[in-house]
């Protein structure tokens, strides 16, 4: 095993998957989490330094359990990269409160569940990095984004607040807001 470890949520596709591959190639232990276990297994087969930890981020207790398993396996987590997200533009042609609640549950509360699971660890460790993936959709309204945009806007505000809360413990918090990525 390597000296450095990164935990990546949303690791089965897109930015999370690409990052998992890159960090593993650079000699890091990669704890890869996502809902789709079959895609995690495919990712795991690409590099011996990628380890799958299936997770539905909307389950608070499961987030805590998965974090504990990662900590037990690697003993240290240097970076937590939370890139879980969902968007279904086909369902946003009309305001659908249930669909918006689901997007908020995954994008905002799912990320918050993961942050809560690492909070005490990083505060005690007094070092580390929490990275939150948002979107340009969090800065201005876009068509068919009645759920997605507000969920990312909430992440922006959360990251900005956590920046100050964790800074006093020597823990970095960063916000990444990419444009559209074909996944």
Roles of regions detected by a PLM:
Residues 120, 164-165:
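Alpha-helical segment proximal to the catalytic Tyr-Lys
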Residues 135:
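Residue(s) in the substrate-gating loop at a strand-loop-helix junction
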Residues 93, 140-146:
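Active-site loop immediately N-terminal to the catalytic Tyr-X3-Lys motif
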Residues 26-42:
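Conserved glycine-rich Rossmann-like NAD(P)H-binding loop of the short-chain dehydrogenase/reductase
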Residues 12-13:
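Conserved glycine-rich cofactor-binding loop
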Residues 91-92, 96-104:
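Substrate-binding pocket helix/loop in short-chain dehydrogenase/reductase
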Residues 115, 151:
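Active-site helix of classical SDR
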């Amino acid at each position: 095993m390597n000296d450095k470890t990164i935990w990546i949520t949303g690791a089965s596709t897109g930015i999370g998957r690409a990052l998992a591959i890159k960090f593993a190639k650079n000699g890091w232990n990669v704890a890869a989490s996502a809902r789709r276990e079959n895609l995690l297994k495919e990712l795991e087969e690409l590099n011996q330094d990628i380890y799958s930890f299936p997770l539905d981020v909307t389950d608070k207790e499961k987030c805590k359990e998965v974090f504990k398993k990662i900590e037990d396996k690697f003993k240290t987590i240097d970076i937590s990269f939370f890139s879980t997200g969902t968007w279904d533009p086909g369902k946003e042609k009309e305001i659908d409160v249930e669909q918006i609640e689901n997007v908020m549950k995954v994008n905002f509360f799912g990320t918050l569940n993961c942050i809560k699971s690492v909070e005490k660890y990083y505060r005690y460790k007094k070092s580390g990095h929490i990275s939150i993936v948002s979107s340009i959709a969090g800065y201005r309204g876009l068509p068919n984004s009645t759920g997605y945009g507000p969920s990312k806007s909430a992440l922006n505000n959360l990251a900005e607040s956590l920046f100050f809360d964790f800074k006093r413990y020597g823990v970095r918090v960063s916000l990444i807001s990419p444009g559209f990525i074909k996944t």
